[in-house]
């Protein structure tokens, strides 16, 4: 399953997020490689909102001082995708730039079943696409970044191209949908 929705974040919340980023109230941390298990030197910058479930105990997972703003955004985004309740495994804003790498390696965000939502927070280089593959690494969908577009997909391998110009801002939410 792969679903796309435009205008996924409420305009007021999108303005709050953009203001936080533009006014430098959100810090980004240098990450040496986009997919740690590959040790490829394709750096990016990350603002961690909720740390990976497998990395740290539950009480210390909320990393962003703006977490409450983001939790409200997540709730709205989940409702747009008709997700009633979810356990979030990780949430972050990834900032990628031209780093001399063409693309990140094919990967899953976790080594266990999860769903994933990507939200483009800016109109970046149109060639900085996200590519979602099937379990045999055959292309299922190629998504062009567009500000405020959200993509929901199942536990599938994927990768993205790094922008050649400008920067690419993507909010990443991995989660498990709770039983109804």
Regions inferred by a protein language model and the residue ranges of each:
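Catalytic core of non-heme Fe(II) oxygenases with the double-stranded beta-helix
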Residues: 61-180
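Non-heme Fe(II)/2-oxoglutarate
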Residues: 1-86
């Amino acid at each position: 399953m792969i679903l796309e929705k435009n205008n996924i974040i409420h305009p007021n919340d999108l303005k709050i997020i953009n203001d936080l980023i533009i006014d430098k109230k959100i810090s980004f941390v240098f990450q040496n490689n986009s997919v740690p298990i590959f040790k490829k030197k394709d750096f990016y910058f990350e603002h961690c909102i909720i740390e990976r479930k497998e990395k740290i105990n539950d009480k210390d997972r909320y990393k962003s001082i703006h977490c409450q703003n983001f939790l409200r955004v997540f709730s709205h985004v989940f409702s747009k995708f008709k997700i009633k309740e979810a356990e979030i495994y990780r949430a972050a804003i990834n900032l990628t730039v031209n780093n001399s790498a063409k693309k990140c390696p094919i990967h899953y965000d976790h080594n266990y079943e999860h769903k994933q939502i990507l939200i483009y927070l800016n109109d970046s280089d149109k060639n900085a696409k996200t590519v979602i593959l099937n379990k045999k690494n055959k292309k299922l969908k190629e998504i062009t970044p567009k500000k405020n577009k959200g993509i929901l997909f199942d536990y599938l391998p994927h990768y993205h191209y790094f922008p050649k110009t400008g920067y690419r801002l993507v909010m990443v939410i991995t989660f498990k949908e709770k039983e109804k």
